[in-house]
Amino acid sequence: VSRGLGDVYKRQIAVSGGNTPALMFDLWANEYMEITPWDRMRIYWVDERCVPPDDSDSNYGMMRNLLLGLTPILYENVFRIRGEAKPAKEAVRYSELVRQQVPLKRGWPEFDIVLLGAGDDGHTSSIFPGQEDLLTSNSIYVVSAHPRNGQKRIAMTGYPIQNARYVIFLITGKNKVDVVEEICHSGDTGPAAYIAHHAQNVELFVDKAAAAYIDDSNKKMN
């Protein structure tokens, strides 16, 4: 993240929710608080569950509690998705906000950093398997729905994610081994793999459990 910030005065960073980003936010607050240039960061969200900010499911609420509430960042530089609003209207509002504030490149917003997680089903940015058409939407944000519980979400689509200067995947847990394999090798088989194979600059950070496939591949090669 520090490398992605560089020397430019304001950097545009889009963050995700989920268990793995929560681990990063906690580490960030406890280990890197003092060296982070908070005055040079603008924070946006990749996706949000359609719930109020104080709901335990809120991605914004999680980051506020684990990190933002502990930092000196000005809230004028924090741009949350309004999960309590009507989903379709909020997707349009937030798309327009991002289009106006984030520099454009090739007609799409160019975030400096997009931080992504991945589910054990291969979803990312609240775009789930079977919803791959949302990846190629001409909108910046769209409404999606969880395939099991039907919970509405607002999700960044494929083109603005792929257009970011850095796309960083954070993946942990042995239940994500197959997802790591998809990302490393199989191309367009799921949303996370699709992004990994189409983004201009991708970095993958995994823990030992999620990296089991990579370890096995290296052993076979050796």
List each language-model region with its residue ranges.
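Single conserved hydrophobic/aromatic residue that forms the stacking wall/gate
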Residues: V1-Y9
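Glycine-rich beta-strand-to-loop/alpha-helix junction loops that act as flexible
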Residues: V15-T20, L116-D120, T172
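A short secondary-structure junction signal
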Residues: A91-V92, S125-G130, V179-I183, D216
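Class I SAM-dependent methyltransferase SAM-binding "motif I" and its flanking Rossmann-like core
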Residues: L116-Y159
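ATP/nucleoside-binding phosphotransfer catalytic cores, i.e., glycine-rich phosphate-binding loops
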Residues: Y159, R165-N222
